[in-house]
């Protein structure tokens, strides 16, 4: 039975093979592929025709809409305001034609411009329609000028945005890359390089005002100074920069200057040698200024710094430190009494001579008695060295019955009532530099130092004189926008904050 089944299967396979052969014979024969080298030249390189891609049909509801930002100004953008601008009489006077304003007639053609105007928190799109006028003689053809509050020279941003970028970077210690991220969250894509250009352009415009403020500060009778450092991103130039502030408390003016290397000669430039006093916190470069030839200012050292040194001794020499702190507190009580009673300079000086002088002598007596017994390199020894100078010089002068030079600098405030007993006003103004170190860590390059110093000078003067810096900057940019060259001195004096 198995043999019979096998023979039947073999027969079926043969029948199927014959049927397949018949089907294959009926099919057309396949063309053999010939290599390109055997083909004729006309058939070797045939231009390949690309198939045209059919555009996808999109529903009208799903069409991509333009972002509501001023950086893609097209027909889909929402216009917030429309202004119609006309030719002014000043334009007619500046033209070469001798025709009067009444001789000009309007032309039907109008130019349209779109501007991005910064309003606190967002941009507003303003569309301007510029009217055109032509004189009867046909020599001049005038077009309405864009107002200064909409656009600045060589910039597509308005003065308000320039002022906002400057204040965020200088006063709010907000680096440019953070400003870029903040604007991106609001829906505006502005690069860091663009923000940097706006900052430098703002500093270039207000540079004459900053120089005028520094010139006035250097002539002050009493000058408060202090310095700080900030790192530089470019290590090839230098690693650190010194930024110094000079304050005229009487006129509420301050001037910032920066140096790559801070020397006594550099600092001497900052103050007029005909002035009387300069206040500082016993920095070595300031003390060297007293030995420069032709320098006439007397140095007054800050008692608040001496008080901090004494305060650090409370854990180690409690009774000694508390005794000195109470005496320094009495000095401040004398100043507070004179301020509350609005005493004149003469009466204020008499009060210092009668009370403060005796207190300073008692402080000197306690410090000189403990100097010899203090252990070298201890905190007590370093505090007395800060007040009286080195021990060798002090011992030589004490034998002669003279007082050290450093202590005489601490007592300079007894000579004139205009001198404050501390240097806190300049330290408060320099506090922003510490904020910069926490937020941005460094400044980009050495060339950017005058940019920051100029902006610091004008903005901190606004704070001293209780002037809104944002509104002041906008007003200055609008007024100086029309000047191509440097403005005259009269206008610069009027634009100083508070004038």
Regions found by a protein language model. Name each.
Residues 1-7, 11-15, 69-74, 132-134, ...:
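Catalytic center-proximal scaffold of phosphoryl-transfer enzymes
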Residues 1-153, 224-225, 355-356, 360:
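Short, flexible loop/hinge motifs at secondary-structure junctions
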């Amino acid at each position: 039975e198995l043999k019979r089944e096998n023979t039947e299967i073999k027969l079926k396979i043969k029948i199927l093979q014959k049927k397949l052969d018949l089907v294959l014979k009926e099919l057309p024969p396949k063309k053999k592929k010939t290599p390109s080298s055997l083909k004729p030249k006309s058939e070797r390189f045939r231009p390949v025709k690309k198939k045209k891609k059919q555009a996808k049909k999109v529903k009208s509801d799903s069409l991509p809409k333009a972002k509501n930002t001023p950086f893609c100004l097209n027909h889909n953008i929402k216009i917030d305001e429309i202004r119609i601008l006309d030719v002014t009489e000043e334009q007619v006077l500046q033209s070469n034609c001798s025709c009067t304003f009444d001789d000009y007639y309007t032309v039907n053609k109008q130019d349209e411009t779109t501007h991005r105007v910064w309003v606190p928190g967002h941009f507003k799109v303003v569309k301007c329609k510029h009217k055109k006028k032509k004189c009867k003689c046909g020599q001049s053809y005038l077009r309405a000028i864009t107002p200064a509050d909409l656009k600045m020279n060589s910039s597509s941003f308005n003065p308000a945005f320039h002022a906002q970028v400057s204040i965020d970077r200088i006063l709010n210690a907000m680096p440019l890359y953070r400003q870029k991220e903040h604007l991106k969250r609001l829906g505006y894509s502005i690069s860091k390089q663009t923000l940097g250009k706006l900052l430098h352009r703002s500093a270039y415009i207000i540079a004459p005002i900053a120089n005028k403020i520094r010139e006035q500060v250097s002539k002050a009778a009493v000058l408060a100074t202090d310095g700080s450092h900030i790192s530089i991103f470019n290590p090839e130039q230098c690693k650190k920069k010194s930024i110094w502030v000079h304050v005229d408390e009487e006129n509420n003016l301050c001037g910032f200057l920066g140096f790559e290397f801070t020397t006594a000669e550099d600092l001497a430039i900052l103050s007029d040698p005909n002035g009387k006093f300069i206040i500082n916190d016993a920095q070595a470069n300031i003390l060297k200024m007293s030995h420069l030839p032709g320098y006439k200012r007397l140095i007054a050292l800050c008692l608040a710094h001496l008080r901090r040194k004494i305060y650090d001794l409370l854990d180690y020499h409690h009774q000694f430190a508390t005794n000195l702190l109470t005496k320094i507190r009495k000095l401040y009580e004398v100043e507070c009494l004179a301020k509350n009673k609005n005493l004149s300079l003469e009466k204020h000086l008499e009060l210092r001579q009668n009370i403060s002088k005796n207190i300073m002598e008692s402080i000197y007596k306690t410090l000189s008695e403990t100097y010899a017994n203090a252990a070298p390199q201890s905190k007590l020894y370093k505090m007395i060295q800060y007040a009286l100078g080195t021990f060798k010089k002090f011992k030589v002068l004490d034998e002669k019955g003279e007082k050290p030079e450093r202590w005489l600098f601490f007592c300079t405030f007894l000579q004139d009532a205009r001198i404050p007993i501390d240097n806190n006003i300049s330290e408060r103004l320099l506090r922003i530099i510490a904020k910069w170190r926490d937020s941005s860590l460094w400044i980009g390059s050495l060339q950017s130092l005058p940019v920051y110093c100029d902006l610091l000078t004008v903005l901190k003067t606004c704070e001293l004189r209780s002037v809104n810096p944002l509104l002041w900057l906008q007003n200055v940019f609008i007024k100086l926008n029309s000047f191509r060259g440097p403005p005259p001195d009269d206008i610069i004096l009027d634009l100083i904050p508070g004038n």
